[in-house]
Amino acid sequence: MSKILITGASGFVGSFLVEKALELGFDTWAVLRKTSSKEYLTDPRIHFIELDLGNDAVLTQQLSEHAAQHGAFDYVIHAAGATKAPNEAAFRRTNTEGTLRLARTLLDLQLLNGRFVFVSSLSVVGAVAENPIRQADGTVAQGLDRYRAITDADTPQPNTAYGRSKLDAERALATLEGLDFVTLRPTGVYGPRERDYFLMADSIKKHIDFAVGYTPQALTFIYVRDLVDACFLALQRGERGRSYFLSDGEVYDSRAFSDLLQQEMGVKWVAHIKAPVWFLHAVCQVSTWISKCTGKMSTLNMDKFQHMRQRTRLS
């Protein structure tokens, strides 16, 4: 029976990764913190392990003790990470340094027999395709064709602290000699247990559709179970050291997305409210300032502002 280590196991994606690992017959080890919830991790076949990805000495001791009793891992899926943080340094500590520390320690202790799959993000690309496309007559293209699609050929230019921390993690992994790894860059992930898209659905349920900007926004998504399937395929497939974008292959207009939510939930009417980008910028600035003062992260912050104002899509 192959042995797999899954980080971020108590999170949205991580809990589904654990379920899939058990379904496929893996000897499954779920990484948790002392404060982590086990709400979706109740299967008695799950083995739990506490790892401190923020401390070299502690992590080395924890993995060494594990190895003495249970041996090495055959595979690792690293899905842990911070999507919200008070500042860029905090993002780097978790997403960049934590990722590098885990992979490096596994290599140093010879505790990884197979592949390391890193769950990164589309956010590493940034706003690389934000200039409107002009048609032969000089006019700007309309609708979802207004901006060109993001492709593998684009050089990443992340415009958020989160995106920069994930890209730096990708680059850090590439410096580790002997590491067999693949990076997955999913677009927006939706499904049961997810909270951010739930907030949008809840807003529609309350008859309000709030949008930012007056030009069309192209949205791309991937269902959580499809992302999970891709993670397990990547254990065996994919070019070593390569990054792969993941989506369901469709492009959605932001209005069409809200209309779909309205239809599926049976909401009879919705007030569609559009706010200028400058207004969202002001709200996110204030929200970020309050978060710094209180120490509590808000869904609306300057990183989220960059994400919400972006118009582009995957090819």
What are these model-derived regions, one by one?
Residues 78, 100-161:
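Conserved Rossmann-fold NAD(P)-dependent oxidoreductase catalytic core, especially the SDR/UDP-sugar
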Residues 51-97, 101, 124-127:
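NAD(P)H-binding glycine-rich loop region in Rossmannoid oxidoreductase-like domains
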Residues 164, 169, 194-199, 213-235, ...:
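Substrate-positioning beta->alpha
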Residues 4-24:
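N-terminal Rossmann NAD(P)H-binding glycine-rich loop of SDR-like oxidoreductase domains
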Residues 234-300:
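Mid/C-terminal beta-alpha module of Rossmann-like enzyme folds, strongest
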Residues 124-126, 182-199:
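Flexible, glycine-rich beta-alpha linker
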Residues 144, 148, 157-182:
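Active-site Tyr-X1-5-Lys
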Residues 31-36, 53:
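N-terminal Rossmann-fold cofactor-binding loop
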